[in-house]
Amino acid sequence: MKRKKTVLHHILAEKQKFEKRKEGGSMSAKDEFGTTKYVIYAEFEANGIVERPDVVGAIFGQTEGLLGDDLDLRELQKTGRIGRIRVEVHAKAGKTYGTITVPSSLDRVETAILAAALETIDRVGPAEAKIKVLRIEDVRATKRKYIIERAKEILETLMEQEIPETQELTEEVKKAVRAKELIEYGPEKLPAGPHVPFSDSIIVVEGRADVLNLLKHGIKNAIAVEGTSVPETIIKLSKERIVTAFTDGDRGGELILKELLQVADVDYVARAPEGKEVEELTKKEIVKALRSKVPAEQVITEIFYKGRNFYEVIKEKERAKNGREEKVREVKPPAPAPAPAPAPKPIEKPEPKEREEKIVKPIQQPRPSELDEFGEFIEKVKSSKDSMALLLDKDKSVIAEIPVRELTNQLKERKDVYAVVFNGVITQRLIDTVSESGVKYLVGARKYNVVRRPVNLKIVTFAE
């Protein structure tokens, strides 16, 4: 009776275990064995047909009292030092074959003794049987392998997640700084960069996002129109500052540009690459677009009156620039012949003369003596990539070479300036400032919206 109860107990236990395995599928070593240190793997062969409960009963029954109370399987299982014994069986040709798995939390020696005890079992149920231990596996080694592999997976996941988070954090901080730099300008509270209140030149863009993108790339003198109608603040600023309109490369950008040119005093026009918006441009694209800016008069004439495309004008401008550079290279070699002196000045002088004569003669005969006087200085500022102004005294000697943005301040401080030669636009505001400083000659790239000419100041442009 006692044997029947034991067998039934093991049958139920094995059934529950089978159901759990069915539900859980394949489990990791950690789930299977818990705190197990070793696993005994054995195989058996019985000369007859036996079932799983017969094998389990034989293991418990035939080892009982064999190894003493300390290594009794039932006691060890109660205390958790031996796990559930797993048995797999299959019958073939009147014999039964199978495997036995015994999880153990005992030490190495006790586990080996227990494994050897299994091989003493010689009968399973009614049939003779033979059990052979195949190996004892160190579960801790398996766990170590599992830990290493799992740690690799966790680290890879962590690295994949951490890098974007770091980038997002950095971007958030930068956005916060840029937003702090953003100011509200004028009664309309227009979004603007921190340099707009005092900068000599400003960049007019369409919206707040455009100003933020320019701030991101270090351009701090931009101000936004914020809408389709041009605010009064922009109109006032355009009369006092050098204004560059920088609009999107789409239909909306063209409409805003038309309105700006009608109501504001715009000096230059720059556009984002065709189909792109200013807010999405990279630093390289922004710099390229601003360097390719076109004078406002040319935009009005070529685009709005003649109906040409803005980007065609830009390409033509680049081709013309490259053509001029090639022409200079061709003309330059014969120039030294009439001037044997080693100094570079005589070589440079004939070159602008020759070029100016070709352009000017068919149009008119304006002040050739003035061009001769300032030809050398005109060539110098024209060849400069940056905005540059030369301040000359009565002897035509350069007393200062400064950026154009510092011209107004320098003229207020100096009283010995006879002439100013620079590569910028001659505006009415600049004419008034120069005239008040006692300057006699003002030489610039071109004139724009000049309505008053002081009698004590001679104005010359490069084209004249």
Curated annotation (Swiss-Prot):
Pro residues bias (residue ranges): 333-345
Listed Pfam families: Toprim_4
Annotated residues for binding of Mg(2+) 1: E206, D248
Gene Ontology biological process terms from the UniProt entry: DNA replication, synthesis of primer
Known EC number: 2.7.7.101
Catalyses which reaction(s): ssDNA + n NTP = ssDNA/pppN(pN)n-1 hybrid + (n-1) diphosphate
GO MF term set: DNA-directed RNA polymerase activity; metal ion binding; poly(A) binding
Biased composition regions of type Basic and acidic residues, renumbered to the chain: 322-332, 346-359
SUPFAM superfamilies the UniProt entry points to: DNA primase core
InterPro entries: DnaG_primase (IPR050219), Primase_DnaG_arc (IPR020607), TOPRIM_DnaG/twinkle (IPR034154), TOPRIM_dom (IPR006171)
Cofactor: Mg(2+)
The organism's place on the tree of life at top rank: Archaea
Entry keyword Electron transport: no
Cofactor binding comment, as recorded: Binds two Mg(2+) per subunit.
Stretches assigned to the Toprim domain: 200-274
Protein family: Belongs to the archaeal DnaG primase family.
HAMAP family linked to this entry: DNA_primase_DnaG_arc (MF_00007)
Subunit structure: Forms a ternary complex with MCM helicase and DNA. Component of the archaeal exosome complex.
Name recorded for this polypeptide: DNA primase DnaG
Species name: Thermococcus onnurineus (strain NA1)
